[in-house]
């Protein structure tokens, strides 16, 4: 039987919509049950306080979860499943909707793909002449603070797909999204390499912990 604490977030969602739930209520809705002597709302509040935010929670590994009372393997699996569902949702949405509808959608997709990665990943979205998504690929992976990017490989893949434009993105596992000098230099190299084949670089987004930097928004592209 559902407890009162379990029903409260559910009834609020049905009455006012899922967006009306606080982070604690949303987490409680997914956890469903508390632990002996601790209701689910209290457990959800303590978990969020421990990790600082939903981002910190969903990007944590099992070793970090084990330090929280009430979080076992089952609840860890539930929460990691939520993060993976979000990642797959945005991936499918990009493929099915075919076009980048807005900068916000692009950012949300890239955050879903790159947030929580422990190494730097360089991802490229390939677009046709109408800016419809042809493919998105993780072309390069690196270390905690560096990824080797080869502009010619980006151009080669774009030509193979008959792409007329690309959006570049990579993550900073450190959490700070501010671009380094190396980030700016590689962006310039990719732009120059693409220009030879009449391929436009629309943006380069750097994804940090709960933040991002868009080269286009800053007027660098």
UniProtKB/Swiss-Prot annotation:
Gene3D superfamilies: Cytidine Deaminase, domain 2. Keywords: Hydrolase, Metal-binding, Metalloprotease, Protease, Zinc. Zn(2+) binds at residues 170, 172, 183. Signal peptide: none annotated. InterPro entries: MPN, RadC_JAB, RuvA_2-like, UPF0758, UPF0758_CS, UPF0758_N, UPF0758_YicR. GO terms for biological process: proteolysis. It comes from the Bacteria. A motif (JAMM motif) lies at residues 170-183. Coiled coil: none annotated. GO terms for molecular function: metal ion binding; metallopeptidase activity. The keyword Zinc applies. Pfam families: RadC, UPF0758_N. Residues 99-221 form the MPN domain. PANTHER family: DNA REPAIR PROTEIN RADC, UPF0758 PROTEIN YEES-RELATED. Belongs to the UPF0758 family. YicR subfamily. This is UPF0758 protein YicR. It comes from Salmonella paratyphi A (strain AKU_12601).
């Amino acid at each position: 039987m559902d407890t009162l604490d379990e029903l409260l977030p559910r009834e609020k969602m049905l009455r006012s919509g899922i967006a009306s739930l606080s982070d604690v209520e949303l987490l409680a809705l997914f956890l469903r049950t508390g632990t002996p002597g601790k209701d689910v709302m209290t457990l959800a509040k303590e978990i969020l306080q421990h990790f600082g935010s939903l981002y910190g929670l969903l990007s944590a590994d099992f070793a970090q979860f084990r330090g929280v009372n009430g979080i076992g393997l089952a609840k860890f699996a539930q929460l990691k499943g939520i993060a993976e569902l979000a990642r797959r949702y945005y991936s499918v949405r990009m493929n099915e909707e075919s076009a980048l509808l807005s900068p916000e959608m692009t950012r949300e997709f890239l955050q879903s793909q790159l947030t929580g990665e422990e190494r730097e990943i360089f991802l490229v979205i390939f677009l046709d002449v109408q800016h419809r998504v042809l493919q998105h690929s993780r072309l390069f992976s690196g270390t905690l603070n560096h990824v080797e990017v080869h502009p010619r490989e980006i151009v080669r893949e774009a030509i193979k797909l008959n792409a007329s434009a690309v959006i570049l993105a990579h993550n900073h596992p450190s959490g700070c999204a501010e671009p380094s000098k190396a980030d700016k230099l590689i962006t310039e190299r990719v732009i120059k390499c693409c220009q030879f084949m009449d391929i436009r670089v629309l943006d380069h987004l750097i994804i940090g912990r709960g933040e991002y930097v868009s080269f286009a928004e800053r007027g660098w592209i």
